UniProtKB/Swiss-Prot annotation:
The gene is PPY. This is Pancreatic polypeptide. The keyword Secreted applies. One of its GO terms (cellular component) is extracellular space. Pfam families: Hormone_3. The keyword Secreted applies. GO terms for biological process: feeding behavior; neuropeptide signaling pathway. The modification Tyrosine amide is found at Y36. It comes from Struthio camelus (Common ostrich).
Length: 36
C-alpha cells in the first residue's frame, strides 16, 4: 500500500502542512477503501 505521509513538524511552512494534510487525506481514503 501507500506510505503514510510524515508530519513535517510544527515549525514547518504552512504550505508543507497543507500538503501533508492533503496527502494524509488521500492516504486515509486509499487505506479505508482497501480495508473493506
Amino acid at each position: 500500500g501507500p506510505a503514510q505521509p510524515t508530519y513535517p513538524g510544527d515549525d514547518a511552512p504552512v504550505e508543507d502542512l497543507v500538503r501533508f494534510y492533503d496527502n494524509l487525506q488521500q492516504y486515509l481514503n486509499v487505506v479505508t477503501r482497501h480495508r473493506y
